[in-house]
Structure formats: C-alpha cells, structure tokens
C-alpha cells in the first residue's frame, strides 16, 4: 500500500521552503483520518493567520521541527488520543528571537539544509492513558516556550552529545567558524536590508552520523542521566533541563538595551561586577552608552551593550539562566544611568524593579561620552550620534524639554556610531561655588594629584562636583554649533581662565561660557580683553552681556584689537545686523571704526537695503550707516529704495530709514522720494507712520521749491487734518515751522469753525497752536469768535465747562492783550457760581480769583 511519510524528505540539492503548502502531512486515501491529522490541520490554519506578523517583522526564523507520529500504513490500531509526537533534532535548530518559541510545521527560511533520514519503519505505536499523554504533552509544551536552543527527546533518539560534536570540534573561539567539510552548508541570509549584521555564514556539518541519528526505528532509549550529563557539556537544553544554563549564542544580534549582563543584580549571589572588565583604554565599536543596539543575542530578553564594562566569561554562561521572564521590548532605562529619561531636572526618579526582566538602577559608573563634547562627537566625523545636550549644573538659561518616549521596537533599526565613549573629560570643569572656583587651594584639594598616564592635550584628569556628561538619556539629535543669531539664544564657548587666542577654546557649547557670561553680568568683565574671546566674537555678539562687553571694548580698544574683531565680524555682518544684540555691535563699528571699515560694512548693505529697512534691528543699522558714511555712499544706498518708498513709509521700521534719508541727503539727490509723495501728502499725513515722514519733509525741505507742493496739499485739507488723530500733528508742525503767510492762511481756513474745533479732542490742539504762533490778526479773530458780540453769547461758558475747550480758554488768557483779558474776565465773573460746579470750570474760576497785580489794578479802576 503506497503511503506518504509525514516527514518531508529533501534531496541533497533541495531547499527547505517556508511555504505552507507542504506543511501538513499528506495521507493516502486508504488510511482513515485520525485526531493527530486534525490537530495538525487546525494548527496549520492558525499558523497561516499569524504568519503575516512574522513576514511583516522581516525577522529571520531559523529552525524547524517535524513531528513524527505513527505511520498511517502501520497495522497497529489507531488510538483516538495519539501519543506525543516524536521530535528528531537537527544539528542546529534556530528559534525566532522575537517570539522565543517553536511553532510546528514551519520550515527553514532561505536555508539550504539537506537532511538525510532513513526510510526505516516507524516504531509501533504504544497505547498510553490520557493522563500520561497529557503529562507528556504539557512537558513538551513547556519546553516549547523556553528561550534559546530547544531540543526535544524521544525514546527513539540517540545520544544528544553527538549533535554538537562537529560544531564544537571545528572551533573553540566564540565566533562563527566555517567548516572544511564538503557536505551541506547552511547560508543564513537576510530577508531585509535592515539586518545587514545578520548575514553571517553558519556552517552545519551533515555526515553519516546525522543520518544514523535521524533514523526511525526501535532503538533503545539511552539512560536519562547520560543524556543530561552530555547536555550539560554541550549546553543544550531539553525537557527537564531548563535549569541548566545555555551556551551563549555568538554572532546573532542582541536585542536588549545596555548589555544587561554587566549588572551584578542579574547574577545569583550578588557578585560585585564593578571591578571586572573596566576598559580605561580607547573604547571601540559596540561599546557605547547613548547609542543603539549593535549586537543582538538569541535570547528572548533584549540587551544593549553597556558603556565599556565587559563581564568575565565565567559569568557569561550563567547569566541568561537567571534572567527573569523575557520581555520583547527594549528596556530604555540603562542600569548605568543615575536618573531615568522621565526624570526632570535635578529631581531623579529612581524606578525600582517592578517589571520582570528589567534591572534596577545600579551604581555602575558611566564612561564619559563624547556625544556631549563637540570636538570628539560623531557629527564631526560624519556619523550619526544619538544623544542630546546634557543638563549642566551651570547651564540654566533654558531648561531642556521632556524628551519623547521612544518606541523600543524600532531601536534595532537605528544606526550607531563607532567609538562613542571617551574616558576623559574637559579640563577645568567645575560645579563648585562661585566664590571658591578661583581659589588655588580649593582646586588642589578637590582635584587631587594629576595622573600623567591619563594626560592628553586639552583634557583634564579628574572631575569634581557633578560630571558634565551624566544625565538623562534622550533620543533627539544633539544641536550643532553654528552662528546662533536667533533672539534669546545663549551661545556656549569654553573656558575663560587662562584663555589664549585662536585655539585655546576646547569647544563652543561647553559650560565655561556660562561662567564667563556670569562674570560679565556681575560687572567683573573689565579684567578681560577682546583678545580673550578672539575666534568667538560672533557668538559673543549674539549674547546680551557679550554684546555689551564688545561694545564697551570697541570704544577704547587698540586699533589692532579692533581690526581683529572686525575681521571676524565682517563675514557675518548681515546676520548680526538683524540680531537683537548683534546689531549694536555693527552700529558700534560704524560709529568707532575707521573710514575703511565703515566703507566695507556699508558695502555689505548693498543689495539688502529694502529687507533690512523693513526689519526691526536692521533698520537701526542702516540709520547709523546713513549718519556716518560718505555722502556718495549714502546716495547709492538710498537709491535702492526707489520704487519701494511708499512701502517703507507705511512700515513701522522702514519709515525711520526714509526719515534718515531725508535728513542726511539733499532733496535734489532724492527726487524719486519727493515724486512718490506727490498727491499722497494728505493721506500720508493721516497715517501713523506717514505723518512722521511728512513732518520731516517740512523740517528739511519746506523752503525748497521742490517741496512747495507738500505745504499746498496740507493747507487745502487743513480742517480735515486738524480733526485727525495724526493729521493734527502735521497742521501744528506747519504752524510751528511754517511762514507767517502759511499761518495766516491756516487761520482763515479755520475761521468760522473755532468754537466747534475748540471742543474737539485733536483740533483743540491746533487752535492752541494758532493762539501761540499766530499773529495779532489771527488771535483777534479767534477771541472775537469765542467771546461773541455781547454778554448773552454763551459759547465762552460752554467752552469753559468742556474737557477740551477749557484749555483753549486758558491759552487765550495767556496770549491775549490786556484789553482782551479784561473783556474775558468780565464775562467769566458773571458765570463764576455756575462754573464752580464743574470740574473743568474750577480751573478758570481759580485763575480769575488770583489775578496778577496789573489785573487787580485794572479791576479796581
């Protein structure tokens, strides 16, 4: 009777495929179905649904196991509850690192592994009770869930010690070795480009011994003690031997942060690991603290490598045996860090070990990382350094934000840089009190004797206080030093004690600039010179205290120092012109620089006059330049505004540049501006910024025949402008700076509306200016219109009670003649009792009751 063996037997040139098409054993039509086949079919359906998860994760699944049950053609009577399946281990059975258990009926993925199995007859099925069968099934299911290399035994299996004989004999080092055998070879290839580290060659020998071990027959089961003893020697775990430690798997990626085998709390007995494996030399690749996984272990518990602390090999084998239940996400909290990432500021959250597989925070020292030392960091070498700016005790300008929690599943895809650790620290970093930092005795007491073996250029030997590179672990990239010219930015430059020009600074974002800036803030910056910050003038110019320091030094410094500062400023002049603090340094150079320096700075403005004129700080630089540069250069700069005059006039910053051009450039040189104002004077006079420009034109160009049209347009609309909140200033300016003819024309224009305008909030100011700057004729017209023809006229009483008109009446008392004053007093005396009831009328009555000596004499007459 032709039947088909449940085990798929491949030839030497065939591959084990991961396809599910051949995963279910096929039976002949003559054999009736049994429960085992049903179970396998259901399991196949379930595994099909879960298979997409494995494919999406793109993780290599090395390993297979084939259940062998009673042969369907066997004449033995079939039992409804079949016996536990018989598993025949291969020489290497790999497991899924993420799931940590075998799944039945799953073949190798892209593995060329010829398996030679004998065609012997299956052993006779021995009927067992349901209790015994369930116990055996439970044992196998428990071993199914164990991590690492899992080999199941059956009564028909031979000694398992030979299964590793070929592999252990080929090499004794913990590395992959390539076999010299001409037999089959298994090339474990990547399924995804993201796992380039996994493309290692694994050699599996296949010889006649393996064929004999895989033969199916009625061989006598070896003694259990023999099996266990040989499994100990090969570190192969089987059912009932999970308590023995497994041999670590070399060459497969570890998926656990910070290489937790370094933590002594993971080893039973609490052995002190602090003195083992400390690398004080240059740390190589794969040993890092704030980095990404570089190596992955085959165990379920993921481990990242720690900062340069490698445990002895004697702990390596026993480490994973005492690990708690596996966690398939990354523990982002390193046991070598003093505060976790969700701690904030100086308040450390020491999280105890609540979750299984997560170590508690130990007091393992942290190797200094150059992620936070700019001259040693990875970005300078072109690599990606993952870390962040640390929270220095002295860098308290801007508190760092809370970093986002990373997704541990994606840590394996991050790139790590080579050799991130740096055992030494920057020199002279202190967190001591300010009063003791400069004390030599205190420094010697804290630092201790120097160590010549650790001396390196620009590096110190000891820390004291808080180590600068120790803090929370963050996932964002560190910032790089550039021209930090944004408002409120705090640049960081290195030390100030013993600075030397050009090259004495170790880095540009160290903590020692804080000390320097604090010295400047406290008023102790006079002991420093510009030569102390040579090479970092731009960074200091963008700081509030640094900018003030440079400005003070530029006023009295030597020409050589000023030239050195100018050479650094000139390439970054355009950026500093728009900086909140840097613009003052540029203005100071325009003011105290020589003619050559002024000309070179003015050349930097060419082509950027319009955008700088519209910028808050750039407009100040242009105004200063127009004050000090040569006349021909002023004209060249002003001509860039042609076509943009009205835009600048209506801008809150640009109008100042237009005013400065009007002040410093002759009218015949800026004819394009006057042409732009023609027909727009009235509207510009009522604009909040345009009214300033019109007033500046009246000051500088009112007597020029080219500017006559400005006055004419103002006089034509003087009544409207007098009532406008901005136009009234233009009208007042004409009364102050204009000619007598212009004042007379304004008086005639306003005649007939004096009382109405005197009660207006803005026009009342114009009437006061008419009384103050107008001639006798204009004043007489105003007084007659207010006083009226006789005493029955009530306009004066109404003005005295008004909040704006009473000021016009008081101005009349100040500017009128004696005869006019007597006439007004006689009118006021008639309404004195009524005026005392009003707030504004009281001022008029009090003035009436305290007349001058001349007035009293005239009143007595």
From Swiss-Prot:
Gene Ontology MF terms: mRNA binding
Function: Sequence-specific RNA-binding protein that regulates translation and mRNA stability by binding the 3'-UTR of target mRNAs. Binds the APUM-binding elements (APBEs) in the 3'-UTR mRNA sequence of CLV1, PNH, WUS and FAS2.
UniProt repeat feature Pumilio, residue ranges: 532-567, 568-603, 604-639, 640-675, 676-712, 713-748, 749-784, 791-826
Record Gene3D superfamilies: Leucine-rich Repeat Variant
The protein's name: Pumilio homolog 6, chloroplastic
Predominant subcellular localization, coarse grouping: plastid
Gene field: APUM6
A cellular-component GO term for this protein: endoplasmic reticulum
Origin superkingdom: Eukaryota
PROSITE patterns documented for this protein: PUM (PS50302), PUM_HD (PS50303)
Natural source organism: Arabidopsis thaliana
Key words, A-Z: Chloroplast, Cytoplasm, Phosphoprotein, Plastid, Repeat, RNA-binding, Transit peptide, Translation regulation
Transit peptide feature, positions: 1-23
Pfam families: PUF (PF00806)
UniProt xrefs under InterPro entries: ARM-like, ARM-type_fold, PUM-HD, Pumilio_RNA-bd, Pumilio_RNA-bd_rpt
Start and end residues of each PUM-HD domain: 512-852
Domain notes: The pumilio repeats mediate the association with RNA by packing together to form a right-handed superhelix that approximates a half donut. The number as well as the specific sequence of the repeats determine the specificity for target mRNAs.
